[in-house]
Amino acid sequence: MAKYLSLEEEVAVRLYTSGYYSGLNRALRGEIAITEEYKVYKELLNNALNKLPKTSSSTFYRLEKWSPESLKKEYITGKTVEKKAFTSSTYDYMAAEEMMFDDASYNVLIKIIGKNGKNIEEASLLPAEKEVLFKSNTKFLVGEIKPIPSPVNPNENIMFINLIEK
């Protein structure tokens, strides 16, 4: 990453994967107050992502946890959603499935067809996640939404959502 990013930017990417993402993304979604530190960090991380090359893949996977009611409000087929927070994903379906085995409370599998995700695994503290990160305020068109058998327990369903980056 050193050939693309300054040391400060590479450290910002690494910090994101350390768990810093949790408070940052909550603040960007409006769940907690956004501090000046988060505002500066958001700009630094977005600038770093702008400098990284696009990934060779265009299909990514993401896991989320939603109540059925909240899911129906957030994701409506044919509508555009703007993700105020950074959107983490993986280019490796098996990595997503493994995360689901580690935490069976994930009840939504999202397949993202994207063009601007940036592979950050080289700077990540968790390279096994094979993380691809989308900038804050990325917009996605909601495609198909349907129940599918859970990879963890095939007798139970999870929701599958297809998102297409705009």
Segments (PLM) and residue ranges:
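Mono-ADP-ribosyltransferase
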Residues: 1-166
